[in-house]
Amino acid sequence: MEQKSIKGTRTEHNLLASFAGESQARSRYTLFAKKAEEEGYMQIAAIFRQTAEQELQHARQFFGMLEGGMVEITASYPAGVVGDTATNLAEAAAGEHEEWGVLYEDFAKVAQDEGFPKIANAYKLIAKVEQMHEQRYLKLLEHLKSGMTFEDEQPVEWMCINCGFTIMAKAAPKRCPVCGVDQGWFERKAINY
């Protein structure tokens, strides 16, 4: 059975807008990572970079569903500046929310209505990832605003992401006693293996 073409459909326009949006998010997050690094937040920088790579994969998925040729779209994208890390986290969370809570829900419905169930499903699955991105950015922002990026109310295990040194404490050391990097290189140790 021949697959239905997306040429000239709203779904085609939505896929291209999604590709452009994911590509731009990747670039913004790369810029935000550099700023976080400059401000001494290495974990936040790493998370921005990881998310940027995930956005590249989303862009790749949307691009791969297109059928070629020139397509004209009209869409709005953030035209802001790189702010401080707190501002960047807030902007990133808002962008992720718009993707999963507004755009991709609508795009999935359009794709379904136009007879593209696989594309609709891709939007639904990617929306779940974008929701997780938003939650992660909001948690990092909460820690940053409350002064809990490098502190906790209870002792936790802190790990230097440069050398692997760990210590159980309420706050990360100001400097790593093993490799000498500053506190910005510490994060709460995650056991995810």
Identify the residue ranges that each predicted region occupies.
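Non-heme di-metal
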Residues: 1-193
